[in-house]
């Protein structure tokens, strides 16, 4: 019998926090799941950590370095469940996450993409802030034209919706989640649970200046594509201005623009 949930996690040289991430999944009270961990060419102690688990629900896929987007798609193609959940290898799923999300999706069959709030923590696990995302489908759609309203590590998606839109776009090394949400918005309703059900770890090197520029270019491409496809109405072309302006701003000023877009 297939599990209820397939959890997909990609890891590259993640020995520092991997054990905490894996155990936060294996310890979920709703235990009817499989955990697929894609070891994306790690050269540290990642393989040894994963080899130490003897839980039949954990499957490890090892591959040469291919990048996050390719790794996630490889994991999704191996999933057996009708619900696919994400968790990054340095984040933590809080104990009631799966139970709360499955209960909501059972009660709302029209919802194909469900996220949650999160607690942002520093590398030592100290609390930085709590993020409460927009909750209802209409709110999320209004936000989606401006910024990414989902915590990637918190999402649970119906697999049939993923199949309809073709998984992550492997030509995008960054912002692949934002692109996927835009495409999913055309085939399914969306929701966020306001409760923080994930710890999202923020590390100093998460967004380098070069990576931030790459992300802005990807955001611009995604929004242009959404306008062309009809996912966004024509008036939303105004939201192309934010990434275009950010690309010509000094890096130190980009954060101000990003916060302004989120406040909307």
What spans do the regions from the language model cover?
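Conserved donor NDP-sugar-binding/catalytic core segment of glycosyltransferases
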Residues: 96-128
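Short, acidic, metal-binding catalytic loop of nucleotide-sugar glycosyltransferases
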Residues: 23-32
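Glycine-rich, basic loop-to-helix element that forms the pyrophosphate-binding segment
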Residues: 63-79, 100
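Acidic helix N-cap motif at the loop->helix transition within catalytic regions
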Residues: 16-19, 44-52, 92, 96
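Conserved nucleotide-sugar donor-binding catalytic segment
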Residues: 77, 116, 130-220
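Short aromatic/hydrophobic "clamp" motif used to bind/position activated sugar donors
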Residues: 84
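A conserved acidic beta->alpha catalytic loop
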Residues: 24, 39-48, 66, 88
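Cell-envelope/extracellular polymer assembly enzymes that use nucleotide-activated donors
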Residues: 3-6, 34, 179
